Amino acid sequence: MYATFTGPVNRNAQLWAALLYAGPGAVLSHETAAEVDGLVDRPSALIHLTIRAGRYLQAAPGIRVHRSRHLRDLRFPAGELPRTWIEDTILDLAETKSGLDDVCGLVTAAFGRHLTTVPPFRSVLAERKRQRWRREISELINAAADGTHSVLEFRYDRDVERAHGLPPSRRQVPFRKRTGPGDSATACTSRMA
């Protein structure tokens, strides 16, 4: 690949070059798709691409190639980077996580950043019969639908409220807090009210 402009090659150009190298049907995936969609804040050192299972692609420096039987036909507007759907990205990343808190962080970040909603996420999870953390992800989707936005909230719901039979708290409820005598009320957001 050759750049047709002067100066440093920016991240967007690197991603397009990797996609062109991989050929038709290749999409950004895993950490790289998460980066493009805003699920993670920092770019990964490697560019992750997914191609259909059964296809061969010689390794290249800085590129990690994944193969998938789950790769769907994707259509993106001209000029937009082809990548896995956010739900597929989350499930692909969940496969690589060693702990539930990491998986929980992915799912709650996706809902908290308004990158997905419950129906499409449930649908994609249902298609993946051998998904690692499947039961836990299903539980996380339900918790996110109820307003859970963090690992801490999920742990509190599961390990404290439900485990001890406590009444459920209300999530993400605005309340008014006075800072002192004569001070005006300040709107805040709290997990419990």
What are these regions (language model features)?
Residues 141-155:
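A short, highly charged nucleic-acid-interacting micro-segment common to nuclease
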